[in-house]
Swiss-Prot record:
This is Protein translocase subunit SecA. Has a central role in coupling the hydrolysis of ATP to the transfer of proteins across the thylakoid membrane. GO terms for biological process: intracellular protein transmembrane transport; protein import; protein targeting. Its main location: plastid. It is an enzyme of class 7 (translocase). InterPro entries: Helicase_ATP-bd, P-loop_NTPase, SecA, SecA_CS, SecA_DEAD, SecA_motor_DEAD, SecA_preprotein_X-link_dom, SecA_SF2_C. The lineage of its organism: Eukaryota, Sar, Stramenopiles, Ochrophyta, Olisthodiscophyceae.
């Protein structure tokens, strides 16, 4: 521990001279008028334009100006630890700062500095709510400095996205950023692209995005030409008739399904198929998906049903992802299971992993409260060093030893009882669960104790009030049940958020309570004129919330849209300030927020995110995890240590728990095994994806060149020549395709190949019999076909020019080229995925699966070029143009 602290101090030491320099500038910066401050920032732009370098002088002045702008606009002054955090971000590293230390404000310091380059800055958050909140809140600082701020949201159209990407600083979610990148590489013209060249990116909750989400690629899909919903329904019916461990084996850890001999016999009997591995082998794929859907994917855990559609719940954030779909037919299998209309099946159009996407940025940085435990992975894969910033106040949270129970029932009973006992003291309680299903169960248990509580999970009716629920989770006697706390954004303040309480009071005063009652019951004095004016506005609660939201969350002094309401809000805030302070002190004396974890997660980082809600900014607080040996982590990765220990102690009373530092250490070791398991998976994904990354670079570069090319005719001619060469080669040597062919079969293949030529040269190629074809040698036949092609191509273009005009035809040809490229890339991705899934079996042949994958992947990519050319040629010449 001592060495770790010394190492962190050494890392921070290099930034201290700059911190001192920024502080020395503060006095002079404070004396600037608003106009002078903006002029000084403009001066930095000009200096950078000349030098193209962020010198220490420019960095210090920019940070100092941004700090002063923050204080003048939102009333917050970045302290020295926040300056350190900003400097770490600017150097392209990860800043670890505890919950409540002001990471959102920290990001403005390097963002404003890097924005002076004019090349754009992206600040990435985990959801639309945080992106909008931060862009609005922090946007006041940027606007004051003369910088423009953009916000990209999921519902925006292309032009609006483009406008926002071209601002100095853009707030956006990781998924929108990635999907826009994929879509930009499928556009038909440069004008349709919404992003510009990447420059600098700051990722909030960087470990959640670069590690937790690294296993799941971003996938753009297109509708498949084949859609057969009946097969999913049949597979679901068959799956429900099979018995686990009798008809099939299911591995919960790997999600693999394997059939027993008994199961195969039963499937063949039900399906009336003599051999399921014969021509009907494809049904097993659908059946495996159906079984997985029924046993591994649970409603209100992995997904919810929203608007009669399956909506995936993110396992790391607990949020609904309505536009996401499971791939490879799994989504359709779940729809069949839930008796929901099966949507059009899709095929991969394009994809990329976050691991490879974010490495596209020349300068990348991130911030989080829980990165140090994943420092090795972040540095080895992303070349991102983690620097821990010390807290501004002494850390006081107590992390109590875990309580381990023999079964789930005993654990949940103990959690409910613990809530009841702690609630008696008045301490606020936060109960963290891993799913909606489990949060519902905790709610049921607390109702038996007649305890009041708030629930925050993926259900839309709860998410609507997310910031209010989290903001008031620190109130006296409050109990809050929440699924995964990563990326919630709002801090839990002891005593509750003053802003949210005042909004509620405003609602009472303006909408419901008469002036006389307000004077007596609330002990407030409001002038009759002010109250009457507010009543005239006929504001509803949502309108009040909208008008004062910047005041409540961020302390802004003026609400432009409604000064009267702002005046009342400010008055209430002053009157309640001492009350909030006293309540916070009282709750601190009680012990602060008590965090209860209901199970250990796959990663210690996620557990620490939950713990981190207590003890913010020097507050008191404590945390404890309640676990059972039936929890998922022990089922999949645990050994028999705990079971043996319970047996040795002969504990007949289920309510007795094991609790000691040794047991907690054993739990930590189990969790470490889980983390290593998933790290190996992520590393494997990264290793295999390297080949796709190289292919993607080549493919996107080629596509970009085509976009820049105004005339595509030369590419079409060259492609046609290659296709004809291949056809001629096949015609003259049909045995290359198959062996042991009869003479009749050879002739049939020749005719089929020649028919391909007829499709290309329909306007010129005369009837030719087999005798003529066989009599011609390879070169003669090729030259003849090329001559016929030129004649046919001229006729084809003449008809097209007469039908749609020369310019439109050129655009048509370019569109065909791009369509063939996209089709080829999509096909290549599907083939690479098939190779990836099957290549693991090569290990049994004493071969390296990764080396074999790269070998076959190279061959597949080379074949993609041939397939693209064929697709292009037939796409162009299969179209008829009619002269009017």
């Amino acid at each position: 521990m001592f060495n770790f602290l010394e190492n962190e101090k050494y890392k921070l030491k290099e930034y201290q001279p700059l911190v001192n320099q920024i502080n020395l500038l503060e006095t002079s910066v404070k004396n600037y008028t608003d106009i002078e401050l903006k002029e000084q920032f403009d001066k930095l732009r000009k200096e950078y334009f000349l030098s193209q370098n962020f010198s220490n002088d420019i960095i210090a002045r920019s940070f100092s100006l941004t700090r002063e702008a923050a204080f003048r606009t939102i009333g917050l002054r970045p302290f020295d630890q926040q300056l350190l955090g900003g400097l770490v971000l600017n150097s392209g590293k990860i800043t670890e700062m505890k919950t409540g230390e002001g990471k959102t404000l920290v990001a403005t310091l390097p963002a404003a500095l890097n924005a002076i380059s004019g090349r754009g800055v992206h600040i990435v958050t985990v959801n639309d709510y945080l992106a909008k909140r931060d862009s609005t809140w922090m946007g006041q600082i940027y606007d004051y400095l003369g910088l423009t701020v953009g916000l990209v949201q999921s519902q925006m159209e292309s032009q609006e996205r483009k406008d926002n990407y071209f601002q100095d600083i853009t707030y956006i979610t990781n998924s929108e950023l990635g999907f826009d990148y994929l879509r930009d590489n499928q556009v038909k013209t440069f004008q349709e692209m919404v992003q510009r060249k990447f420059n600098y990116c700051i990722i909030d909750e960087v470990d959640a995005i670069l590690i937790d989400e690294a296993r799941t690629p971003l996938v753009l899909s297109i509708p498949d030409t084949i859609h057969n919903p009946k097969i999913y329904l049949d597979a679901n019916t068959t799956a429900k008739s099979l018995i686990r461990d009798v008809d099939f084996k299911a591995d919960e850890k790997t999600k693999n399904i394997t059939f027993t001999d008994i199961g195969i016999d039963k499937i063949e009997y039900f399906r009336k198929i003599p051999n399921i591995y014969g021509t009907n082998a494809g049904f097993l794929f659908y059946l495996q998906n159906a079984i997985s859907a029924n046993i591994f994917f649970r409603k209100n855990s992995e997904y919810i049903i929203e608007n009669n559609k399956i909506a995936i719940v993110d396992e790391f954030t607990g949020r609904v992802m309505p536009v996401r779909r499971w791939s490879n037919g799994l989504h359709e299998a779940i729809e069949a299971k839930e008796s929901i209309d099966i949507t059009q099946t899709s095929r991969i159009s394009s994809s990329i992993t976050y691991q490879n996407f974010f490495t596209l940025y020349p300068k990348l940085a991130g911030m989080t409260g829980t990165a140090k435990s994943a420092a090795l992975e972040l540095e080895s894969i992303y070349n991102l060093e983690v620097v821990v910033i010390p807290t501004s106040k002494k850390f006081q949270r107590k992390d109590l030893p875990d309580k381990v129970y023999t079964n789930d029932f005993a654990k949940w009973k103990a959690i409910a009882k613990e809530c009841f006992e702690i609630h008696k003291t008045g301490r606020p309680i936060l109960v963290g669960t891993s799913s909606i299903e489990k949060s519902d169960f905790v709610s049921f248990l607390l109702e038996n104790y007649k305890l009041q509580y708030n629930v925050l999970n993926a259900r839309p009716e709860n998410l609507k009030y997310e910031s209010e629920i989290v903001g008031e989770a620190g109130c006296l006697n409050a109990i809050t049940i929440a699924t995964n706390m990563a990326g919630r954004g709002t801090d839990i303040i002891l005593g509750g958020s003053p802003g949210f309480k005042i909004i509620r009071l405003l609602k009472i005063l303006v909408l419901k309570v008469k002036l006389k009652e307000a004077r007596t019951k609330k002990g407030l004095f409001l002038t009759h004129e002010l109250y009457k004016e507010l009543q005239k506005e006929r504001l509803n609660y949502d309108a009040i919330t909208q008008l004062v939201k910047f005041e409540t969350e961020f302390g802004q002094k003026q609400i432009v849209r409604q000064k009267k309401l702002s005046t009342l809000f400010f008055y209430l805030k002053i009157n309640y300030k001492s009350r909030f302070k006293k309540q916070k002190q009282y709750i601190n004396q009680l012990g602060g927020l008590y965090v209860i974890g209901t199970e250990r997660q796959d990663s210690k980082r996620i557990d620490n995110q939950l713990r981190g809600r207590a003890g913010r900014q020097g507050d008191a607080g404590s945390s404890r995890f309640f676990v059972s040996i039936e929890d998922k982590i022990f089922r999949l990765f645990g050994d028999n240590k705990f079971s043996n220990l319970f047996n040795q102690l002969n504990l007949t009373n289920e309510e007795i728990s094991l609790e000691s530092d040794l047991i907690t250490k054993t739990l930590d070791n189990t969790q470490e095994r889980v983390e290593n398991y998933y790290y190996d998976i992520r590393k494997q994904v990264y290793d295999y994806d390297e080949l796709i990354t190289e292919q993607r670079k080549t493919f996107y570069l080629f596509r970009s060149k085509v976009l820049k090319t105004q005339v595509s005719g030369n590419l079409i001619i060259a492609s046609t020549e290659d296709v004809i060469k291949k056809i001629v080669k096949s015609i003259k040597t049909p045995q290359l395709k198959f062996t042991n062919l009869t003479h009749k079969q050879e002739n049939q293949i020749i005719l089929e190949d020649f028919e391909q030529c007829r499709r290309i040269m329909r306007y010129a190629l005369p009837p030719i019999n087999l005798k003529q074809i066989n009599a011609s040698n390879h070169n003669v036949l090729f030259e003849f076909l090329m001559q016929e092609f030129w004649i046919s191509y001229d006729i084809h273009k003449t008809k097209a020019f007469s039908s749609i005009g020369e310019e439109y035809y050129k655009e048509y040809e370019r569109s065909c080229v791009l369509e063939s490229i996209d089709h080829g890339w999509s096909t290549n991705l599907e083939k690479m995925e098939t190779i990836r899934e099957s290549i693991v079996w090569r290990v049994y042949a004493q071969k390296d699966p990764l080396a074999e994958y790269k070998k076959e992947g190279f061959s597949t990519f080379r074949k993609m070029d041939e397939e693209m050319k064929r697709f292009l040629v037939f796409a162009v010449f299969d179209t008829d143009f009619y002269v009017t």
